[in-house]
Amino acid sequence: FLVFLSLTSCTLNPTGIQLNPAWTSHSLSAWHNHHPDMMVVSQDKQWLYVSCETNASLLAPSLLAIHIETGKQHILLFGLHKADGLKVAPDGSLWLGEEFKDGLFWRITEPATLPSEQRVDRATLASSTPAIMPLHRVGNFKHEGLAFSKDGQFAYMADEWKEGCIYRYNLHTHQLKVLHKDKGWLLIRDAKHARMDAEKLHGQYFNRIEDMETLPNGQILLAETKTGRILKLDDRSTLPKVSTWLENNALIHPDNLAWDDKRHWLWITDDDDPSYLWAWDGHTLREIAHHDSAEITGVTLHGSDVYINLQQNLGQPDVLLRLREKAHVNDL
């Protein structure tokens, strides 16, 4: 039995979030046992989509849809196993990944036009609509990190485990390749067993890449949570190169990333105890918020507004928050 509560009129702070004095928070929604993780804003800027990291069940939510202007929301999809990675593709569709070793990416076309409560039968991979389909050629592995190239040619993905590789999928030729440290991109011949193929090809290992974000210059940032580093993938020349982009003693387990076009900041959630929300301006790592018990997840931007989830332990409601700088609040 699924419950979600609207908190659009909430002005108090019952959530336990500790905020930088220059910021305010506003609770938009609360859910029980939805495990909200990644968030994206639709291409037309009207919808906020939230992945739900639940176990596969026809009654377990996998994707929430929230209309940004009205606050109306619904469960768009049930049934995936540990839905996590989420991005808007160049064609406006949603790619929703499953975070387990045999996970798939699922493509959802025109999500704003779909009726609520669509379903996937995870045992048969059948869906309630042709608009939701598994992307078999993208590969089976633990999908969390995802980014698209600036020119719309490639999807970059990371296998989120201690010896996980980075993959590149050509959206036009449908070839899947793995990154080799010295040889560049090598062809994966069996997408269903991509991890095994990557090991045979000696793909470069990373220690749990949690999220990926495309910068305005086309470089791809990678949150390597176990090392505490933000890495940079530069794939703009013949031989791709990975280097450290940010390493800071205060940053322990970087998780979700979001580039802020207005402020030119990188937003970072930190899956430590307590959990933090950081903003990196190129010189200083600023603490914007922290929470002593909930995990801060899914940071994303809509204009100057910052959206985050509070993913709670069992028994406590998960919460969606909108953060605003007080200077911007006064301008409204």
What does each model-found stretch correspond to?
Residues F1-F4:
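Sec-dependent signal peptide recognition
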Residues T8-S9:
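C-terminal motif of bacterial Sec signal peptides marking the signal peptidase cleavage site
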Residues L12-L332:
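Sequence/structural signature of beta-propeller domains
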